[in-house]
């Protein structure tokens, strides 16, 4: 089965590897471009100390995301089919709940939440991961 066919069939192994790679790239980007991410979230009219804290926060967020990507890839490679599907389903649900809570919490702070074009892709990707796991759990 080709990679495209595996993706179309929502093979949990393929989906988990893709999600892991996306998470790794996102974490690396956030870490490398922490200054840009901090400015987009907190604005440019903040003190030097606040800017340093905001950039550090963004770097930590990037570092936090990278192991999640590695965990997703590792689970895709080492678990058997049934457990991989279960992991895809439940890890997707947990991350979806986390992101919902995260974005709701961020609205209560001075942090400028990302615009809708940055919010939809993670939710869509996690939805695909959850559905992939659900579809293959019973097989």
What positions do the PLM features span?
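Cytosolic juxtamembrane helix and N-cap/initiation of the first transmembrane helix
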Residues: 1-26
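Membrane-interface helix-boundary motifs at transmembrane edges
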Residues: 5-8, 77-85, 110-112
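Residues within membrane-spanning alpha-helices of integral membrane proteins
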Residues: 13-20, 62, 92-96, 119-122, ...
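Hydrophobic transmembrane helix segments
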Residues: 21-64
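Aromatic-anchored segments of alpha-helical transmembrane domains
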Residues: 23-26, 94-103
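Juxtamembrane helix-break-helix junctions at the cytosolic face
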Residues: 70-89, 93
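Membrane-helix boundary connector in multi-pass membrane proteins
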Residues: 99-119, 134-137
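Membrane-water interface at the C-terminal end of transmembrane alpha helices
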Residues: 124-139
